């Protein structure tokens, strides 16, 4: 009887440890973007973040997978909303979160929340997705960038883009919740 339950029990106990183990980082450019040609060819679907750490990060937006989330990013970027905002929650080996004007994870834009657009895009290194509260339909202005793959988040958050350039600068975003000296978005722009 013990043998019948020992192996499955051991597998269950070990699974969380393996699921949360950091994965060796690969360059973002080496990972597939899973974007159709029509998306990658459109410069208006490039979101550029100039960071206070001296780097520039370029995100390929995916309106084919998350049209409402991408339109929200574009609208707020055109308004200058992201300029000066900090990455307020940065967990090494997991992700960097920004887009909150309050800087504590509780803020958002004055615009209404966006409904969830869960899609088939996976949480890989460089994935950019909409941060939200407990309700799936509570995304607003906050977003996060993955340092490592985390499949446990797939189909639970709206993935709307992928870093295609400057992942090394994402890796240099100051850690902390919040960081003592946070990395900021100096300027966010579209195109390029």
List the model feature ranges, each with a label.
Residues 2-8, 18-192:
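Cyclophilin-like peptidyl-prolyl cis-trans isomerases
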